């Protein structure tokens, strides 16, 4: 591609960003991804929920022309994306099983004529032979695969229908592919590249950090009473509560309703129309809380979810990260609360051991152990999360329960040296349970058969409890001194960073193991910033009225972050309104006048 054409496309991309989507500048990573896509090169985009993944393919789709096909797993997610694009004046459509034959034919005609620029479609429909024949005759410019982790058996949400997408590369070798996901560790990323046949892709891994989310944990004591108090502290904010079973979902929703709280149950056992009604009410701010199994959420693009509660511990960190990521997508403060009982972990482990032995069970065990380590962490929870995804961080976040209410610290160098020495002496071939048994001098047949009762480290930690040593080793993992090798049954292995600690050359503080029993802390009462709270409330009321009249969710009009900026800047002219993030040309034309009129009346005092 000629240099002049590249520069022109980059200029057009910024113009599309500002005029169509109403943002003044790209977020970190977006510009590189968009430029790479415009060069016709494959991309793998790993970006947190709320980080702006969709713009990475939507902007190039509008710059390069032709049709961009977006593979999406859920009808609700497709519809939501299409609604938002249409509100921004973008010719977008979706094909799904809820449409009539006439509606589907109309969409197909729009694709054939070049009128439709972005088409959202489920993987199973895309891979039908007759659809692929149509696709071959359209001006296809790019293929985007959203929720791409679903293609990998290593991923936490494997979907067999995604596996067939690998055949597309052979059919369309010249078309650039873009795979996108919010959650993919290094192994899953390699799987995505291999299974989709991505050719020398740009692999852009953005920070997994969601700094606006406060990570909290509460040990279960009287769980329902604790939950009721927590929800009441949220003062009417939108939230999602996840439970591991349908019966618990229904019971919890009923308990909330009996307390006068606006809540509804959502799980796969409900009729389709019931689920659709719950989701629509939640999207439109007519329902405060959804109590759900994991069946709920992937299709949710609601930016003003202020809290996510896990009433039961998830089976892996990927699920936890993705589900908590549904909070605070507007970048405003949000909270993730995990209710924890060690017995829940024991139950999940028993369920896992009942599954057939093999590599998949090993993967699930490794992921479950990591989730347990997160729940029982004595160090910054954000650091545990980020280190799990391979993003090394050193500084505590200051915005989790551990940072806000730190556990007591002690000089842990001697304990660390004992644990590291034991891992080393058993040749870095054994998991945590076995290492702790050697440390505490357990008298069992396996240790005797291995000859480890003769080691100098045998029993050097017998004065401390089993729980103490588990806590110490988990902290060493969190600090990056020890890793768990899943290929060797989660064997503990030392990293280079362990050497100076093992030799006693550096100080090391560890946390005294404790039972975590924090009272729920309500989020800050407001979002901070110097904006007019009274005007913000009026803008929200106007937004809801317009959304109801237009039959769309309120955030499709403007999200909370945009309204806060309006309440801060009080824009009175079209030019001033366009300087507000989230206000593009089309939205200004469609919604601008009533908002500017309300702001004018507020400034002049005419609405009192």
Language model features: what each stretch is:
Residues 173, 235, 378, 428, ...:
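Flexible coil/turn residues that form the inter-helical turn or adjacent wing/linker of helix-turn-helix
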Residues 3-7, 11-20, 24-28, 32-44, ...:
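Helicase motor core with emphasis on the C-terminal RecA-like subdomain
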Residues 1-13, 363-365, 394-608:
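Accessory DNA-binding and partner-docking regions appended to nucleic-acid-acting proteins
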Residues 360-389:
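Short, charged low-complexity linear segments at domain edges
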């Amino acid at each position: 591609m000629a240099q002049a054409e590249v520069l022109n496309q980059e200029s057009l991309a910024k113009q599309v960003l500002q005029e169509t989507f109403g943002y003044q500048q790209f977020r970190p990573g977006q510009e590189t991804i968009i430029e790479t896509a415009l060069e016709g090169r494959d991309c793998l985009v790993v970006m947190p929920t709320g980080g702006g993944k969709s713009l990475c393919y939507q902007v190039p789709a509008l710059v390069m022309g032709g049709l961009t096909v977006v593979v999406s797993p859920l009808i609700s997610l497709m519809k939501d994306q299409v609604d938002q694009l249409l509100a921004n004046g973008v010719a977008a459509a979706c094909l799904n099983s809820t449409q009539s034959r006439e509606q589907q034919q109309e969409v197909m005609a729009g694709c054939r004529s070049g009128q439709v620029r972005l088409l959202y479609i489920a993987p199973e429909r895309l891979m039908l032979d007759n659809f692929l024949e149509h696709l071959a005759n359209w001006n296809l410019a790019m293929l985007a695969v959203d929720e791409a982790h679903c293609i990998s058996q290593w991923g936490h949400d494997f979907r067999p229908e995604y596996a067939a997408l690998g055949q597309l590369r052979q059919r369309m070798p010249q078309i650039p592919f873009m795979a996108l996901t919010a959650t993919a560790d290094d192994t899953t990323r390699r799987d995505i590249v291999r299974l989709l046949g991505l050719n020398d892709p740009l692999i852009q891994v953005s920070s997994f950090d969601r700094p606006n989310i406060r990570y909290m944990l509460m040990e279960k004591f009287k769980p329902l009473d604790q939950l009721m108090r927590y929800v009441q502290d949220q003062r009417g904010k939108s939230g999602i509560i996840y439970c591991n079973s349908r019966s618990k979902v229904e019971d919890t929703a009923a308990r909330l309703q009996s307390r006068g709280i606006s809540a509804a149950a959502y799980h796969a056992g409900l009729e389709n129309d019931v689920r659709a009604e719950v989701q629509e009410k939640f999207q439109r701010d007519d329902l405060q809380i959804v109590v759900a199994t994991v069946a709920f959420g992937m299709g949710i693009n609601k930016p003003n979810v202020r809290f996510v509660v896990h009433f039961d511990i998830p089976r892996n960190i990927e699920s936890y990260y993705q589900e908590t990521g549904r909070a605070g997508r507007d970048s405003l403060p949000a909270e993730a609360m995990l209710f924890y009982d060690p017995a829940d972990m024991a139950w999940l482990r028993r369920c896992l051991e009942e599954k057939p032995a093999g590599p998949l069970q090993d993967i699930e065990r490794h992921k479950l152990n990591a989730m347990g380590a997160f729940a029982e962490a004595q160090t910054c929870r954000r650091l545990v999360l980020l280190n799990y995804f391979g993003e090394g961080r050193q500084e505590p976040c200051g915005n989790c329960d551990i940072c806000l209410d730190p556990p007591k610290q002690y000089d842990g160098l001697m304990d660390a040296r004992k644990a590291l020495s034991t891992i080393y002496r058993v040749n870095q071939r054994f998991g945590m349970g076995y290492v702790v048994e050697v440390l505490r001098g357990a008298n069992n047949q396996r240790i005797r058969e291995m000859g480890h009762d003769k080691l100098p480290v045998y029993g050097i930690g017998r004065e401390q409890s089993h729980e103490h040593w588990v806590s110490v080793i988990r902290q060493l993992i969190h600090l990056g001194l020890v890793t768990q090798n899943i290929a060797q049954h989660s064997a503990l292995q030392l990293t280079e960073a362990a050497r100076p600690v093992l030799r006693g050359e550096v100080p090391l503080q560890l946390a005294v193991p404790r039972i975590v029993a924090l009272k729920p802390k309500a989020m800050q009462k407001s979002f901070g910033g110097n904006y007019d709270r009274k005007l913000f409330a009026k803008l929200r009321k106007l937004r809801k009225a317009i959304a109801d009249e237009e039959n769309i969710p309120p955030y499709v009009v403007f999200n909370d972050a945009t309204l806060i900026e309006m309440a801060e800047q009080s824009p009175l002219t079209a030019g001033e309104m366009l300087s507000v993030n989230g206000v593009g040309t089309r939205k200004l034309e469609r919604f601008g006048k009533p908002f500017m009129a309300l702001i004018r009346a507020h400034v002049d005092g005419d609405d009192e």
